[in-house]
Amino acid sequence: EMTSSLVGSEMCIRDRYLINQGIQQLTKDHSLVEEMVRLGGIKPEEAKHHPDKNIITRAIGAKADVEVDFYEHRLKRGDIILMCTDGLSNMVEDEELFHIVQGGRDIVESGQALIEAAKENGGTDNIGVVLIEPFADEVSVL
């Protein structure tokens, strides 16, 4: 069992994905564009490149009280958690993220391959990647 939380768009880690048989985004940003998607104003594929994608609707310190979203996830053997900045998620489509992580490399090589894919796709923003394999037999750190 894993609990994650979110306020805003997480300056350090923007997106959290669960990867196993497919890719699933675990959290939703508190952003104007995410709200537009939720209300049907734009399609999810339009959100990634929308000019207002960085306008957040919730942030720590913006008000005395802030609402935090908590998410519960049941994990199983083979799951891999990907946390990343938008320097990765804006440059590499979900399908490519999935294929890189499930491509038979070890977790460190997968992380390096994700960064390279973002650079090859024209990434100029900072690219942060954390991959966690909760049921791994050994720990690898880069």
Task: Say what each PLM segment does.
Residues 1-8, 13-15:
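Single conserved hydrophobic/aromatic residue that forms the stacking wall/gate
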Residues 10-14, 55-64, 70-100, 119-121, ...:
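Conserved beta-strand-loop-short alpha-helix elements that form
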Residues 18-22, 134-135:
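Short acidic-glycine loop/turn motifs at beta-strand connectors
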Residues 28-77, 141:
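Conserved, helical-rich catalytic subdomain that frames metal- and/or nucleotide-binding sites
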Residues 107-120:
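Short, well-structured alpha-helical segments that form the helix of a local strand-helix-strand
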Residues 135-142:
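P/S/T/G-enriched low-complexity
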